[in-house]
Amino acid sequence: MLQLWKLVLLCGVLTGTSESLLDNLGNDLSNVVDKLEPVLHEGLETVDNTLKGILEKLKVDLGVLQKSSAWQLAKQKAQEAEKLLNNVISKLLPTNTDIFGLKISNSLILDVKAEPIDDGKGLNLSFPVTANVTVAGPIIGQIINLKASLDLLTAVTIETDPQTHQPVAVLGECASDPTSISLSLLDKHSQIINKFVNSVINTLKSTVSSLLQKEICPLIRIFIHSLDVNVIQQVVDNPQHKTQLQTLI
Protein backbone atom coordinates (compact mmCIF):
# COMPACT_ATOMS: atom_id res chain seq x y z
CA MET A 1 0.00 0.00 0.00
CA LEU A 2 1.28 3.44 -0.87
CA GLN A 3 2.36 5.30 2.25
CA LEU A 4 0.48 8.48 3.11
CA TRP A 5 3.53 10.73 2.83
CA LYS A 6 4.25 9.39 -0.65
CA LEU A 7 0.68 10.02 -1.71
CA VAL A 8 0.84 13.61 -0.44
CA LEU A 9 4.21 14.12 -2.15
CA LEU A 10 2.90 12.62 -5.38
CA CYS A 11 -0.10 14.95 -5.43
CA GLY A 12 2.11 17.97 -4.80
CA VAL A 13 4.68 16.99 -7.41
CA LEU A 14 2.07 16.16 -10.02
CA THR A 15 0.19 19.40 -9.45
CA GLY A 16 3.27 21.56 -9.94
CA THR A 17 4.78 19.43 -12.67
CA SER A 18 1.59 19.00 -14.67
CA GLU A 19 0.81 22.73 -14.59
CA SER A 20 4.29 23.55 -15.85
CA LEU A 21 4.14 20.82 -18.49
CA LEU A 22 0.73 21.91 -19.71
CA ASP A 23 1.86 25.53 -19.98
CA ASN A 24 4.98 24.59 -21.93
CA LEU A 25 3.15 22.05 -24.09
CA GLY A 26 0.38 24.54 -24.79
CA ASN A 27 2.87 27.15 -25.98
CA ASP A 28 4.77 24.62 -28.07
CA LEU A 29 1.66 23.18 -29.70
CA SER A 30 0.24 26.63 -30.35
CA ASN A 31 3.32 27.35 -32.45
CA VAL A 32 3.04 23.95 -34.13
CA VAL A 33 -0.60 24.53 -35.14
CA ASP A 34 0.47 27.70 -36.97
CA LYS A 35 2.91 25.55 -38.96
CA LEU A 36 0.36 22.81 -39.65
CA GLU A 37 -2.33 24.96 -41.24
CA PRO A 38 -0.39 25.85 -44.41
CA VAL A 39 0.55 22.17 -44.82
CA LEU A 40 -3.13 21.31 -45.15
CA HIS A 41 -3.65 23.79 -47.98
CA GLU A 42 -0.45 23.22 -49.95
CA GLY A 43 -0.53 21.06 -53.06
CA LEU A 44 -4.07 19.77 -52.62
CA GLU A 45 -6.56 19.84 -55.49
CA THR A 46 -10.02 21.36 -55.14
CA VAL A 47 -12.66 18.71 -54.46
CA ASP A 48 -16.41 18.70 -54.90
CA ASN A 49 -18.76 19.38 -52.01
CA THR A 50 -20.20 15.87 -51.80
CA LEU A 51 -19.54 13.96 -48.62
CA LYS A 52 -17.38 11.45 -50.48
CA GLY A 53 -15.24 14.24 -51.89
CA ILE A 54 -14.89 15.95 -48.53
CA LEU A 55 -13.94 12.79 -46.65
CA GLU A 56 -11.46 11.80 -49.33
CA LYS A 57 -9.88 15.24 -49.01
CA LEU A 58 -9.66 14.80 -45.24
CA LYS A 59 -7.84 11.50 -45.79
CA VAL A 60 -5.41 13.18 -48.19
CA ASP A 61 -4.93 16.03 -45.73
CA LEU A 62 -4.21 13.57 -42.95
CA GLY A 63 -1.69 11.67 -45.06
CA VAL A 64 0.13 14.85 -46.08
CA LEU A 65 0.02 16.15 -42.53
CA GLN A 66 1.63 13.06 -40.98
CA LYS A 67 4.56 13.32 -43.40
CA SER A 68 5.21 16.96 -42.55
CA SER A 69 7.96 18.15 -40.23
CA ALA A 70 5.37 20.17 -38.30
CA TRP A 71 3.43 16.99 -37.45
CA GLN A 72 6.60 15.24 -36.32
CA LEU A 73 7.40 18.25 -34.14
CA ALA A 74 3.94 18.10 -32.58
CA LYS A 75 4.35 14.40 -31.86
CA GLN A 76 7.79 15.02 -30.35
CA LYS A 77 6.48 17.76 -28.04
CA ALA A 78 3.61 15.58 -26.84
CA GLN A 79 5.95 12.64 -26.24
CA GLU A 80 8.44 14.79 -24.31
CA ALA A 81 5.75 16.08 -21.97
CA GLU A 82 4.32 12.60 -21.45
CA LYS A 83 7.75 11.09 -20.82
CA LEU A 84 8.69 13.75 -18.27
CA LEU A 85 5.45 13.28 -16.36
CA ASN A 86 5.79 9.48 -16.47
CA ASN A 87 9.33 9.74 -15.09
CA VAL A 88 8.00 11.62 -12.08
CA ILE A 89 5.24 9.07 -11.49
CA SER A 90 7.45 6.00 -12.03
CA LYS A 91 9.77 7.04 -9.20
CA LEU A 92 6.89 6.55 -6.78
CA LEU A 93 4.58 4.10 -8.55
CA PRO A 94 5.75 1.21 -10.77
CA THR A 95 3.90 0.95 -14.08
CA ASN A 96 3.39 -1.80 -16.64
CA THR A 97 5.60 0.19 -19.01
CA ASP A 98 8.48 -0.13 -16.53
CA ILE A 99 7.81 -3.80 -15.79
CA PHE A 100 7.72 -4.92 -19.43
CA GLY A 101 10.13 -2.33 -20.85
CA LEU A 102 7.36 -1.51 -23.29
CA LYS A 103 8.03 1.00 -26.06
CA ILE A 104 5.83 2.42 -28.83
CA SER A 105 7.21 3.51 -32.21
CA ASN A 106 6.08 4.30 -35.76
CA SER A 107 2.53 5.14 -34.75
CA LEU A 108 0.38 6.04 -37.76
CA ILE A 109 -3.21 7.14 -38.33
CA LEU A 110 -4.42 5.10 -41.31
CA ASP A 111 -7.77 6.68 -42.04
CA VAL A 112 -10.57 8.94 -40.85
CA LYS A 113 -14.14 7.62 -40.74
CA ALA A 114 -17.27 9.59 -39.93
CA GLU A 115 -20.84 8.86 -38.97
CA PRO A 116 -23.56 11.43 -38.22
CA ILE A 117 -24.57 11.98 -34.61
CA ASP A 118 -28.24 11.13 -34.04
CA ASP A 119 -29.21 14.74 -33.31
CA GLY A 120 -27.73 15.84 -36.64
CA LYS A 121 -25.48 18.43 -35.02
CA GLY A 122 -22.14 16.74 -35.43
CA LEU A 123 -20.09 13.71 -36.40
CA ASN A 124 -18.72 10.68 -34.63
CA LEU A 125 -15.15 10.20 -35.84
CA SER A 126 -13.06 7.05 -35.88
CA PHE A 127 -9.30 7.01 -36.52
CA PRO A 128 -7.76 3.55 -37.13
CA VAL A 129 -4.20 3.58 -35.76
CA THR A 130 -1.27 1.18 -36.02
CA ALA A 131 2.05 1.13 -34.17
CA ASN A 132 5.07 -1.04 -33.51
CA VAL A 133 5.47 -2.30 -29.94
CA THR A 134 8.57 -3.75 -28.32
CA VAL A 135 8.41 -5.70 -25.07
CA ALA A 136 11.35 -6.86 -22.98
CA GLY A 137 10.20 -10.10 -21.36
CA PRO A 138 11.27 -9.87 -17.69
CA ILE A 139 11.51 -13.65 -17.36
CA ILE A 140 12.63 -14.82 -20.78
CA GLY A 141 15.09 -11.96 -21.29
CA GLN A 142 14.28 -11.40 -24.97
CA ILE A 143 12.94 -8.48 -26.99
CA ILE A 144 9.53 -9.22 -28.47
CA ASN A 145 8.23 -7.23 -31.44
CA LEU A 146 4.50 -6.74 -31.82
CA LYS A 147 2.14 -4.93 -34.18
CA ALA A 148 -0.68 -3.01 -32.53
CA SER A 149 -3.86 -1.73 -34.09
CA LEU A 150 -6.85 0.04 -32.57
CA ASP A 151 -9.47 2.71 -33.22
CA LEU A 152 -9.44 6.08 -31.50
CA LEU A 153 -12.92 7.56 -31.18
CA THR A 154 -14.11 11.12 -30.73
CA ALA A 155 -16.91 13.43 -31.83
CA VAL A 156 -16.95 16.90 -33.35
CA THR A 157 -19.82 19.38 -33.21
CA ILE A 158 -20.28 22.83 -34.68
CA GLU A 159 -21.12 25.48 -32.10
CA THR A 160 -21.28 29.28 -32.08
CA ASP A 161 -18.48 31.12 -30.31
CA PRO A 162 -20.19 33.39 -27.73
CA GLN A 163 -17.61 36.15 -28.26
CA THR A 164 -17.15 36.19 -32.03
CA HIS A 165 -20.54 34.67 -32.92
CA GLN A 166 -18.71 32.61 -35.54
CA PRO A 167 -19.07 28.83 -35.95
CA VAL A 168 -16.31 26.79 -34.31
CA ALA A 169 -15.55 23.08 -34.26
CA VAL A 170 -15.72 21.59 -30.77
CA LEU A 171 -14.02 18.25 -30.26
CA GLY A 172 -15.31 15.84 -27.63
CA GLU A 173 -13.34 13.38 -25.53
CA CYS A 174 -10.85 11.26 -27.45
CA ALA A 175 -10.53 7.67 -26.28
CA SER A 176 -9.59 4.25 -27.60
CA ASP A 177 -12.23 1.67 -28.45
CA PRO A 178 -11.42 -1.22 -26.07
CA THR A 179 -12.99 -3.75 -28.43
CA SER A 180 -10.75 -2.75 -31.35
CA ILE A 181 -7.28 -3.29 -29.84
CA SER A 182 -5.29 -6.17 -31.29
CA LEU A 183 -1.68 -7.28 -30.86
CA SER A 184 0.15 -9.70 -33.12
CA LEU A 185 3.69 -11.06 -33.08
CA LEU A 186 5.82 -9.77 -35.95
CA ASP A 187 8.38 -12.58 -35.87
CA LYS A 188 8.32 -16.31 -35.30
CA HIS A 189 9.03 -17.18 -31.70
CA SER A 190 9.40 -20.22 -29.49
CA GLN A 191 6.48 -21.75 -27.65
CA ILE A 192 7.75 -20.21 -24.41
CA ILE A 193 7.53 -16.68 -25.80
CA ASN A 194 4.10 -17.35 -27.27
CA LYS A 195 2.88 -18.56 -23.89
CA PHE A 196 4.39 -15.52 -22.16
CA VAL A 197 2.66 -13.11 -24.54
CA ASN A 198 -0.64 -14.94 -24.17
CA SER A 199 -0.37 -14.83 -20.38
CA VAL A 200 0.00 -11.04 -20.29
CA ILE A 201 -1.95 -10.11 -23.42
CA ASN A 202 -4.76 -8.31 -21.58
CA THR A 203 -2.28 -6.21 -19.60
CA LEU A 204 -0.33 -5.41 -22.76
CA LYS A 205 -3.49 -4.42 -24.63
CA SER A 206 -4.54 -2.08 -21.84
CA THR A 207 -1.10 -0.47 -21.59
CA VAL A 208 -0.59 -0.08 -25.35
CA SER A 209 -4.10 1.33 -25.73
CA SER A 210 -3.42 3.91 -23.03
CA LEU A 211 -0.04 4.92 -24.48
CA LEU A 212 -1.39 5.35 -28.02
CA GLN A 213 -4.34 7.34 -26.73
CA LYS A 214 -2.02 9.72 -24.89
CA GLU A 215 0.25 10.11 -27.92
CA ILE A 216 -2.24 10.36 -30.78
CA CYS A 217 -5.29 12.10 -29.28
CA PRO A 218 -3.50 15.48 -28.94
CA LEU A 219 -2.51 15.20 -32.60
CA ILE A 220 -6.07 14.39 -33.65
CA ARG A 221 -7.20 17.49 -31.79
CA ILE A 222 -4.62 19.56 -33.68
CA PHE A 223 -5.73 18.03 -36.99
CA ILE A 224 -9.41 18.84 -36.41
CA HIS A 225 -8.68 22.36 -35.21
CA SER A 226 -6.46 22.95 -38.25
CA LEU A 227 -9.36 22.24 -40.63
CA ASP A 228 -11.63 24.90 -42.04
CA VAL A 229 -14.81 24.77 -39.95
CA ASN A 230 -16.82 25.02 -43.20
CA VAL A 231 -15.47 21.65 -44.32
CA ILE A 232 -16.82 20.01 -41.18
CA GLN A 233 -20.08 21.91 -41.50
CA GLN A 234 -20.56 20.62 -45.06
CA VAL A 235 -20.25 17.04 -43.85
CA VAL A 236 -22.70 17.67 -41.01
CA ASP A 237 -25.24 19.41 -43.26
CA ASN A 238 -25.06 17.01 -46.21
CA PRO A 239 -28.57 15.56 -46.58
CA GLN A 240 -27.29 12.30 -48.07
CA HIS A 241 -24.57 11.69 -45.53
CA LYS A 242 -25.94 8.39 -44.19
CA THR A 243 -26.01 6.61 -47.56
CA GLN A 244 -22.67 7.98 -48.70
CA LEU A 245 -20.95 7.23 -45.40
CA GLN A 246 -22.01 3.61 -45.55
CA THR A 247 -20.41 3.29 -48.98
CA LEU A 248 -17.14 4.67 -47.64
CA ILE A 249 -16.84 2.76 -44.39
Swiss-Prot record:
Family matches, as Gene3D superfamilies: Bactericidal permeability-increasing protein, domain 1 (3.15.10.10)
The reply on keyword Nucleotide-binding is: no
**Disulphide-bridged cysteine pairs:** C174-C217
Glycosylated residues in this chain: N124, N132
UniProt GO molecular function: lipopolysaccharide binding
Tissue and organ expression note: Detected in submandibular gland. Secreted into saliva.
GO biological processes: defense response to bacterium
Return the GO cellular component terms, semicolon-separated: extracellular exosome; extracellular region; extracellular space; secretory granule
Annotated compartments: Secreted
Tell me the keywords, alphabetical order: Antibiotic, Antimicrobial, Disulfide bond, Glycoprotein, Secreted, Signal
What biological function has been recorded for the protein in this entry? Has strong antibacterial activity against P.aeruginosa.
PANTHER family given in the database record: BPI FOLD-CONTAINING FAMILY A MEMBER 2
Q: What is this protein called?
A: BPI fold-containing family A member 2
| Annotated source species | Homo sapiens (Human)
Organism lineage reads as: Eukaryota, Metazoa, Chordata, Craniata, Vertebrata
